[in-house]
């Protein structure tokens, strides 16, 4: 989709679909202006529709004998309450209303005079991401026509076009994450993730190292390797690196959970455990892949970024890990596996040890780790655990700017006793109460003291059955925009 600015007013703009954000009571008189332009009794028509300018209101009116094919009105709520999140939702609603139409979408929203560039970029991202559809696995794809050009109307500075250049790389990263999460487990395997990394490295000049099973054995990654004992698929430990053109003053590491399918192992997922949806247990790896895709094109200065994904399947056969087995992680920590369905933290443990050896300035891991986080925060907010206030604030600000829900949770150290094992250094799960906290405390054991680290549990946010906001139903690509914001912010400090 081509994105540009247009100096035209809504009274003069011509294109396929004209979409206007309308606050309650229409203080700017846009409805009256459209009545005059299109010779419509628009006010009378709106009285018959559920449209009063409230958030969520959206109506589309086909236009005959006009240089536009449709007029879309999107409610914004009280004018004084319009913020960037509301602009995103309005832009996404306008995009969906324009679906089925080709050509150009003209969009007018009340851009902030203080942050017009950020508002415009957020709206442009919302339009592109809301129009996303996945037809890869249909025998007869039925793609709906959609606008191929977006023109942003209103009082936007002419130099703002440069700021919109980041929209396409960021959206491409989100779309990559969505594709990886949505694809079935017979399509996205550990080997396929490795091929995806190879493609990114080749296309964008990134460095790539892939550790095979024997390489992981040499490094003592017994925690990671225990998870894949029952799978015929070979594990892949993927290390992708972005290096800036200039000297790097910061080194950041992104770690993503990469379980391409999780049966639960001998603690088999049954009942409401959604075994049929466990293709999305690699949502953390999808997020960091998407972030690297965007960063590779944006090329922020002064920051070096490493992506680590310990990818495998958790399956059952005669060689699969047993409940009660004791394994040794690459830092020498022994772990009693009291639940084979708490496997993600076992893969992340060795990835975090590897990350620390890179001597980073910060580590952030993302994982679909616990159902407890979903119970606590629902499906629109991810949980954040960190003992570093500065890193937590950076990530919260990055998520807020991205419009992605993120809430800091307590890393309550007294709960560490719940991981105590009679035989090993620790168990891989604690009591059911506070399960997402003990999961984070488990991961903390594999991060060197003094290295800022944050864990983001995206179990609820990685998928949306019905769609919400910018996200169609299915994979959301959550986390990509937050990570990109965080990295680019670090590049600027």
From Swiss-Prot:
Catalytic activity: Release of an N-terminal amino acid, Xaa-|-Yaa-, in which Xaa is preferably Leu, but may be other amino acids including Pro although not Arg or Lys, and Yaa may be Pro. Amino acid amides and methyl esters are also readily hydrolyzed, but rates on arylamides are exceedingly low; Release of an N-terminal amino acid, preferentially leucine, but not glutamic or aspartic acids
UniProt-annotated binding residues for Mn(2+) 2: 257, 262, 281, 343
Active site per the UniProt annotation: 269, 345
Origin species: Synechococcus sp. (strain WH7803)
EC numbers for this chain: 3.4.11.1, 3.4.11.10
Gene Ontology biological-process entries: proteolysis
Name of the protein this chain belongs to: Probable cytosol aminopeptidase
Keywords: Aminopeptidase, Cytoplasm, Hydrolase, Manganese, Metal-binding, Protease
Gene that encodes the chain: pepA
